[in-house]
A protein has these predicted regions:
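Conserved Helicase C-terminal RecA-like lobe
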Residues: 13-39, 52-168, 239-256
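SF2 helicase/translocase ATPase core recognition
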Residues: 14-43, 141, 156-240, 244
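Cytochrome P450 catalytic domain signature, combining two hallmark sequence patches
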Residues: 44-50
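A residue-level signal for conserved active-site and pocket-lining positions in enzyme catalytic cores
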Residues: 2, 68, 223
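Generic structural signal of hydrophobic/aromatic residues within well-ordered alpha-helices
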Residues: 45, 229-230, 248-249, 253
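Conserved P-loop NTPase motor "coupling/switch" region that bridges the ATPase
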Residues: 1-12, 200
Length: 256
């Protein structure tokens, strides 16, 4: 009698069968008005920090971090009186236009549904075809959207990181944009793997959009210096920064 056995392939073995994955960090400069807005709210956050207990007031600190992130991404999702497109939005649209011009597909991931809604409006203006999947998308519609994107000529798939960062097969895409990279590197990698997986026949280009001289760039620096921080931070979890030291938290709000 022959004993049964299970053949498993490690991820590294699978990667050998895939085309290259090219990862790019795209540093975007603030406009003059954006820089003034960002620095004003950074100063406000630092004033508030002086009144908080870093070990107890983590929810308020997380709220300040989130607001600064949103200002980096697109001030229009925070302030009704801001009318101009953000520098990061412009950079994202430029990348998308390149893919559209070359008849290639690209996915955009964001943690913020409001940002995806705004991006969708910009795509409408340029008559760029897209699908969108967020937490509001019915489960019954998810498969239909994926199948359509895999087989039709739609250029862009806008996806909420929390709603669609796992469980989707989108190998028709050759590009992935992370609009607002954050602590959770494993979540970002899983999202990238919606395109970079078995069945992918082309190189996949990954773009992380980062505002220069901002909280986003500080986060990237901390990630590089201390990769285990990425595993401590989970999006949407109010207790996600409880394991960070006060010094680590304060470094995010420094103005240098």
């Amino acid at each position: 009698m022959i004993s049964p056995f299970v053949l498993r392939r490690t991820k590294n073995e699978v990667l050998k069968d895939l085309p290259d994955k090219i990862e790019n960090t795209v540093l975007v400069d603030f406009s003059e008005d954006e820089k003034k807005l960002y620095l004003a709210h950074l100063a406000e956050a630092n004033q508030l920090l002086k009144t908080l207990d870093g070990s107890k007031d983590r929810i308020q600190i997380l709220a300040m971090l989130t607001k600064l992130r949103q200002i980096c991404c697109e001030p229009r999702i925070v302030f009704d009186d801001v009318k101009h497109m953000s520098s990061k939005m412009e950079a994202c649209l430029n990348i998308i236009q390149t893919y559209k011009d070359n008849n290639k597909k690209i996915i955009v991931f964001s943690s913020f549904k409001s940002l995806l809604n705004l991006l969708a409006k910009e795509l409408d203006k340029s008559k760029t075809s897209y699908y969108m999947l967020t937490g509001d998308t019915d489960k019954a519609d998810r498969k239909g959207l994926v199948d359509a994107y895999q087989n039709d000529d739609t250029t862009v798939f806008l996806i909420s990181l929390k709603a669609g960062g796992t469980g989707l097969n989108l190998t028709a895409a050759e590009g992935v944009i992370h609009f607002d990279p954050w602590w959770n590197m494993s979540a970002q990698n899983q999202a990238t793997d919606r395109a970079y997986r078995i069945g992918q026949k082309n190189k996949v280009f990954v773009y992380k959009l980062i505002m220069a001289d901002s909280i986003e760039e500080k986060i990237q620096t901390l990630q590089a210096a201390k990769k285990d921080l990425a595993d401590r931070f989970v999006e949407g979890n109010s207790g996600s920064i409880t394991t960070m030291s006060g010094e680590e938290i304060m470094s995010l709000f420094s103005e240098d």
